[in-house]
Regions:
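Lipid interaction determinants
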Residues: 1-83, 88-90, 94-97, 104-184
Length: 184
């Protein structure tokens, strides 16, 4: 991350805090293209944060492999949020629609997926953060892995990669995994 990106990120955080999260709610409306896995540890324990940062790179690498097997990769995954609280999510060749609720100060988001004939994603509760021009949508690690499993192909390589990620995830409480997007 260069200094310009760091400055944008800091500025967006200041504006978001000053507006009680309303800036994120307003600025998240639009089309977002998937870029990379998102990983965040919510903890007040500095030692745990250091431990988490040590495995974040490996976790992101394994998530990227797992996501690719489920059709989630750059250029093939996007989210669109509308002002009327509806969203469209595309994972590879699969498109899902639904509604969302966003709570500004806590950054909580609830994605209510409409029922599909093949997939039942239900409601996903997570967190949404804007950092400069990037959007992060994160979910409790175990819930995200269940969603990816629903989308994933039943291949041996999927199961092996999922097991590796699950092992890494099991080492941390309050771990959020998800997606990083850039605005289209």
């Amino acid at each position: 991350q260069d200094w310009k990106e760091a400055l944008k990120s800091a500025a967006s955080n200041v504006v978001d805090k000053a507006t009680g999260g309303k800036a994120t709610e307003t600025l998240m409306i639009g089309d977002w293209q998937y870029e990379a896995p998102g990983v965040k540890l919510e903890s007040d324990n500095a030692l745990a944060d250091v431990g988490a940062s040590a495995v974040t790179g490996k976790m992101e690498e394994q998530l990227e492999k797992l996501y690719a097997l489920a059709g989630i990769r750059a250029g093939a995954c996007k989210f669109s949020f509308a002002a009327d609280k509806r969203f469209t999510a595309t994972f590879g060749s699969r498109t899902f629609t639904g509604t969302y609720e966003f709570t500004g100060e806590s950054h909580d988001i609830a994605l209510h997926f409409e029922m599909s004939s093949k997939y039942d994603l239900g409601t996903l509760n997570g967190k949404t953060y804007l950092s400069g021009t990037d959007l992060q949508i994160l979910f409790p690690a175990t819930r995200l892995l269940k969603m990816v499993d629903v989308l994933g192909q039943k291949l041996a390589s999927f199961s092996t990669t999922a097991a590796t990620v699950s092992t890494l995830v099991g080492k941390f409480d309050d771990l959020y995994l998800g997606f990083e997007f850039t605005k289209q």
